Amino acid sequence: MNKNIIFSFTVLTLFVIFVQVTGVIGNLQQRRQMNQTWCSRPLLTHKQTGKCVIEDCESKCRQKWKGNGTQATCRNQCNCHFRCPWIQGQP
């Protein structure tokens, strides 16, 4: 009788450890998928001057890609940097 209790307790302990370990691995895989993937797209420069004006560039970026944490940079042209929902598996 005592051996049966020890065996049952051992099996139960191993099962609980297995469930906890597989749950941790599942959480790590989900966290890995949640990493942000950034995209960059060029936009047209200022029509009159042909130069990139950062205020206009930021405004156009926010209008085109709303709610995606957009950022704009001006070098030779206006570039928008935003989170890519289609790469992250979001609609």
Curated annotation (Swiss-Prot):
Superkingdom of origin: Eukaryota
GO cellular component, one term: extracellular region
Sugar-bearing residue positions: N35, N68
Annotated localization: Secreted
Signal peptide boundaries: 1-26
Any one GO biological process: defense response to fungus
SS bond partners: C39-C84, C52-C74, C57-C78, C61-C80
Main location: secreted
Assigned keywords, A-Z: Antimicrobial, Disulfide bond, Fungicide, Glycoprotein, Plant defense, Secreted, Signal
PANTHER family with a match to the protein in the record: DEFENSIN-LIKE PROTEIN 144-RELATED
Family to which the UniProt record says this protein belongs: Belongs to the DEFL family.
Record's protein name: Putative defensin-like protein 145
Annotated source species: Arabidopsis thaliana (Mouse-ear cress)
Lineage: Eukaryota, Viridiplantae, Streptophyta, Embryophyta, Tracheophyta
